[in-house]
Amino acid sequence: MIKSDIASTVPIIAIDAMGGDVGLDTTLAAVLSVKNQYPALKLILVGNQSIIEKHSLFPQIASQMEIVHAEQIVAMDESPSSVLRHKNDSSMWRALELVQQGKADACVSAGNTGALMGCARFILKMLPNISRPAICSTVPNRYGHVHWLDLGANVSAKPEQLKQFAIMGSELSKAVDNIASPTVGLLNVGSEAIKGNDIVKEANTLISATDLNYVGYVEGNDLFLRKDLNVVVCDGFVGNVALKTVEGIAKFIQYGMEAEFKRSFFSRLTALVALPALKRLKKRIDPRMYNGATLLGLQGLVIKSHGNADPIAFANAINLARLEVENNVLHRICEQLQLNPEHDQ
């Protein structure tokens, strides 16, 4: 449901209570945390009502919570086609239906990414003039953070689709970062004009012709070291591989530091001295604080939480949905698409 102006009422967010690897323990703890922070926010739990009501945390939120019953659960390894055929009474499906029916402003799910994308496209449909959806996530860098898309919705993308991603990413940054004119970069193998394949070169031409604050080609290291960068655009194959590489390197460094600090008495002493700085660094790059990827390009707001998110991480995904509803991201994107009409898709 696309609203025509900035939301004037309290956001209503549908929560897929049964999705993800950890289930209700995480979901209800996160909901309790968010409700304590934003008491007026309306959250709808979607899932097996009997199981939800029997959970030990439910009495603490029962008076503030609506439950929409759904009999089925989407497994994390279930194929999108199987879910579309057989799981139309699942918590994921029913949560998306609430958005489609205008009974909720956004849906948050920690469920199967492929199934969520497939169901969202089927139930909510694509925005006018958007041919492909994109997964947009926020990653920390030296100067704050950057919004990065596409991170896996499409293994390839046409130049026109990369332009669409740039428009959607820019509007998302305006909404959640409160930046009037976010900078947008196109991920490439080099910053020189001669670098890149034909798709990237044509996308560069198309994005340059828009009214976006486009800074041209950017390289992988720019995501973390460049100050004047708010949005980075690429196809889903490149984005997903790059993101998982970064996540792997981060874990490698973490494990390596832990091993070295435990190696001897002196290294333990060094760790003790460095502990305050290490805690600050850990908090700054804590992936839980950036949990929640937006499925852009749909006629409804959908936030994908990490499947193994803890309560802190899942609460941040809910808060991202709240922020996007309050700033009417969908309407902003639609307005920009009208200012930058499509050519061949």
From Swiss-Prot:
One of its GO terms (cellular component) is cytoplasm. Keywords: Cytoplasm, Lipid biosynthesis, Lipid metabolism, Phospholipid biosynthesis, Phospholipid metabolism, Transferase. It catalyses: a fatty acyl-[ACP] + phosphate = an acyl phosphate + holo-[ACP]. GO terms for biological process: fatty acid biosynthetic process; phospholipid biosynthetic process. Its EC number is 2.3.1.274. It is found in: Cytoplasm. Pfam families: FA_synthesis. Its main location: cytoplasm. Pathway: Lipid metabolism; phospholipid metabolism. GO terms for molecular function: phosphate:acyl-[acyl carrier protein] acyltransferase activity. Catalyzes the reversible formation of acyl-phosphate (acyl-PO(4)) from acyl-[acyl-carrier-protein] (acyl-ACP). This enzyme utilizes acyl-ACP as fatty acyl donor, but not acyl-CoA. Belongs to the PlsX family. Homodimer. Probably interacts with PlsY. NCBIfam families: plsX (TIGR00182). This is Phosphate acyltransferase. The lineage of its organism: Bacteria, Pseudomonadati, Pseudomonadota, Gammaproteobacteria, Cardiobacteriales.
